[in-house]
């Protein structure tokens, strides 16, 4: 697949921006899927908030969200030696961030998160994005520079909790089985969207685990005076091989994905980002490009009273729902100044569908109410 050219990098950062693990943990990113689901985290991968995760699925869109995949961790083997590109903080154990010394660049290519990892003479590029309109996150790994093939292990952590809660060991039970190119995790006692998650990589073999990883410390939650210890299950590890110049993708999804899907998700995000920047008349203007792309993250779909899909606006990530008051206040900035007048009209029509006696509800009813 030929990857579309990205717009100029946004928020292009190097190691000078993160002199230590604490500094790297203060730099956060966000990707969304247009349903209310999201992926968010820190530059280094260090979890700081209960909301940080690779796949936070909109299981009851747009406001009902479930943490399914808090993170995946990369381990790279070169010439028989393995390096962990990881960062964790444990209750009572401090910060363990061996990967930070290998992170040489972080930037946003449109709405795509891009990291460059250097391990000796090896340069590995990692791209992260969400599929539009469904609950799937994609990671595309490209071996940009190496004298020989390398092996990458993708260690997959799963959870099953409302995104504003935390888990304790044995809070949920799951069944782990093989799937094409990876693993299928079924969450016992749950049905519908989010009852299972597929962890798959191109050309990979999967090894199931099931071990509980306890005592993830979330420092921002602690600073705010909230519960701050989380626990997740290691579903297992996917192992793949990369040749110099080769790309292979990984997906975390609520459905089984076809081979090559991660690359298609990344490419679609790059194309969409370019179109959004062009529509806003912001090509070449980094500040306005960032505003146009950030504005897009707040726009979601909502089911209307007659069952049709309409438009709405999330009042803020990661914890707010969609509110009509905030939608009307933000409409000029989100949609008119960004060249998206037809979508502004759709938003107004969607809000009007909830009108009663000349009034609009600030909060929307749940399905069936």
Q: Model-derived features: where do they sit?
A:
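Acidic, mature catalytic/reactive cores of soluble proteins
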Residues: 1-369
């Amino acid at each position: 697949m030929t990857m579309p050219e990205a717009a100029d990098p946004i928020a292009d950062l190097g190691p000078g921006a993160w002199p230590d693990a604490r500094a790297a943990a203060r730099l956060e990113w966000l990707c969304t899927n247009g349903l209310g689901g999201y992926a968010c985290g820190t530059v280094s991968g260090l979890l700081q908030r209960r909301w940080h995760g690779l796949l936070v699925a909109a299981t009851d869109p747009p406001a009902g969200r479930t943490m399914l995949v808090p993170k995946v961790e990369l381990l790279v083997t070169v010439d028989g030696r393995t390096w962990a590109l990881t960062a964790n903080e444990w209750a009572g154990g401090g910060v363990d961030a061996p990967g930070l010394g290998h992170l040489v660049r972080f930037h946003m290519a449109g709405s795509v998160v891009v990291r460059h990892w250097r391990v000796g003479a090896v340069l590995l590029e990692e791209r992260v994005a969400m599929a539009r309109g469904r609950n799937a996150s994609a990671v595309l790994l490209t071996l940009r520079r190496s004298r020989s093939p390398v092996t990458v292990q993708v260690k997959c952590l799963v959870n099953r909790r409302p995104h504003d809660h935390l888990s304790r060991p044995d809070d949920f039970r799951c069944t782990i089985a093989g799937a094409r190119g990876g693993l299928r995790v079924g969450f016992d006692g749950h049905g519908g969207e989010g009852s299972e998650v597929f962890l798959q990589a191109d050309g990979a073999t999967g090894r199931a685990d099931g071990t509980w990883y306890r005592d993830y410390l979330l420092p921002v939650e602690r600073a705010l005076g909230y519960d701050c210890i989380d626990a997740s299950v290691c579903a297992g590890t996917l192992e793949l091989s990369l040749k110099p110049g080769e790309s292979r993708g990984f997906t975390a999804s609520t459905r089984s994905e076809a081979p090559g899907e991660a690359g298609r998700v990344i490419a679609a995000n790059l194309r969409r980002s370019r179109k959004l920047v062009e529509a806003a008349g912001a090509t070449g203007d980094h500040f306005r490009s960032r505003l146009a792309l950030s504005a897009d993250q707040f726009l979601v779909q909502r089911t209307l009273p007659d069952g049709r899909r309409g438009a709405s606006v999330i009042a803020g990530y990661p914890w707010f729902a969609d509110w009509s008051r905030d939608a009307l206040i933000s409409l000029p900035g989100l949609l008119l100044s960004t060249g998206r007048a037809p979508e502004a009209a759709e938003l107004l029509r969607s809000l009007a569908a909830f009108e009663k006696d000349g009034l609009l509800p600030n909060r929307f009813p749940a399905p069936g109410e």
